[in-house]
């Protein structure tokens, strides 16, 4: 009987895996933004007033379930569950459901960051969650679910990251490790995810996926309901799954164990793009970007310049604090035809534990904007930088076209076309790029969407005239505000 059940699980996993790679975007939209720690009401408004009109495809939201309350309210308290009640500092279940509906109505899908690996870590006394639920993490007692000690793996510490048992059955940074092979645990996780599906979400980012056995996740994913047709999804549509698997290429638990279950976060993309645009690797080598660099196949890779974790670490990863290089890297990310793209929207931080912007009562505050639409009160909002949202529009305009006419100067100046719909040039040298280059575009004058916008037929920034052969004179000065230029057919003057 066990062999039959296992075979059935594997069969279901195989038949559903391709469906779980589909993010269910509207039209030609194809970029996700992570609105890290935003409130549900603010996300709903952002969908209606900015993300929808600018062509964003979806939002990754912070964990929605009740979490532990930690002193100072660090961002990581959201990653320490107390129960699966939908009450956090971002809002309650009613506000969450309202956000999902309003975002779906304007073509912006919602993907929830979900915690299936663990509950909260030890607490000195009885812990209280954001919905008022009490728990005793040290005893592995979580009445709000309920979970008891029998629902967890035995307590042990990860000391050897090359030991599969430790990685998948011991406690990640002291967080109480759930036993996903347990029928009861599986039922509660499936119930939680199905509730979110009923509310209209399009899928899930699965936190700490490498710390769970892939066969257990296959069972859980395969047991989920189809997406809710009342929110515009077709019949039999499966939730989009993207899984956090940190794999630097030498891990005992490999990304390849998860890639057929759904997309996988391609951390090597983030690391290598940071090295390149920091000047530690010549941009000319990016011509073979993607699988040529040993990355996952394009439909299985969730790609990003930085995320909420690695932007807080030392190393090559670029973040908002290096804006010129960050914008160049993001432009390349969104222009090059590889991966399922996600852009980051951060809040300012000075140390690893900095909480999101909050008031004196420790309530998350709403972002405020200046006359140009940029955030001003502790929220960084990279997605509102013109150079980034303009590239979201570029990516929409060139969707389903191939890369062609790669050019480089043998160093850190590059350009390429996307079919006959788009052209990108980057200068990361300390001298000017001044060159007649093939843009592949039809003859005409085009607005550079990096330096300006096309408004009422006029360009507020640079413009490039393309001749009948598709060539245009491209100039990016070494001291220009931005080291990138982007043209596309929807920005023709």
From Swiss-Prot:
The PTM Pyrrolidone carboxylic acid maps to: 20
Q: Name one Pfam family in it.
A: Alpha-amylase
| Binding locations of chloride | 205, 307, 342
The record's section on SMART domains has:
Aamy, Aamy_C
**Which enzyme class?**
hydrolase
Q: Which cofactor does it need?
A: Ca(2+); chloride
For this protein, the record's InterPro entries field holds: A-amylase/branching_C, A-amylase_C, Alpha_amylase, Glyco_hydro_13_cat_dom, Glyco_hydro_b, Glycoside_hydrolase_SF
What GO molecular functions are on record for this protein?
Answer: alpha-amylase activity; metal ion binding
Q: Where in the cell is it found?
A: Secreted
Q: Which residues are listed as membrane-spanning?
A: none
Binding site residues for Ca(2+): 117, 168, 177, 211
Q: Which family does it belong to?
A: Belongs to the glycosyl hydrolase 13 family.
Q: What name appears for this protein in its UniProt entry?
A: Alpha-amylase-related protein
The gene from which this protein is expressed is: Amyrel
